[in-house]
Amino acid sequence: MKLTGAFATITALALGLTACGTASDPSSSKGGSGKADASAPLVVAASPTPHADILTFVKDNLAEKAGLKLEVKEFTDYVLPNTATQSGQVDANYFQHKPYLDDFNKKNKTTIVPVVNVHLEPLGLYSKKLKSLKDLKAGQTVAVPNDTTNGGRALKLLADNGVITLKDGVGANGKLSDIKDKKGLEFKELEAATVPRALNDVDAAVINGNYAIEAKLSPAKDALALEKAEGNPYANFLAVRKGDEKDARVQKLAELLNSPEVKKYIEDTYKDGSIVSAFGAVK
């Protein structure tokens, strides 16, 4: 999931999502029954990259053999996939992580639930001036994203690698005021998309995986520190309306998305480390 300052919006009309008109009132639809026609196509809303790419790999290489008919609808915003899932206009979606979904459900009174983790787009600490973490000293400046989600992730990455110490009990949305010990470092908050452009002006910067790639940085090779996939709350997952996780088609897709074939596809396609597999249950 790539959180940016502005999202291109695909209209409901263009995607054929106007038939019921319920997307404008997502809380109007109750949870699913899990009793859908097993022979019907499973329609999944997804962001184009890597989500739709991964689903297309499953559709073209694994689904037919598994007896699953899969239809992928691409969305470039982060609202319609959930509203369309809640209203039943699509069966599932794959584009988001847990902190985002929790916030979305709370604000919109929706009942979307995660099914299974698939991948992570890791944040990394980068520098054009330092060669390793041990070179980061008091008095130097670190740039971090200024939005709540990515800012909190950045602080956790720094804390996990001993760069800073956070106060006890700081959750996923930590702020600079939650730092217990800055270890003499200065911090500069910037919009996530602009952080790579500041690399020449700071000593180090925490950059989202997608923005690192755009800046021609390789997470696997260039990052001084990189988020770990295991147990990461920012892993992107397959999600459905509550009750539909019992749908046999959903369970089959979840199995395929966590298959050795998909793991190999991710490894072979994203050798730069911008996308890594993060299989398993959502916690």
PLM feature spans:
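Bacterial lipoprotein signal-peptidase II cleavage site
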Residues: G16-A36
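Extracytoplasmic "Venus flytrap"
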Residues: S27-S28, K35-K59, T76-P81
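Short helix-initiation/N-cap motifs at beta->coil->alpha
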Residues: V72-T83, V170-R197
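Ligand-binding "clamshell"
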Residues: D103-V115, L130, D201, V206, ...
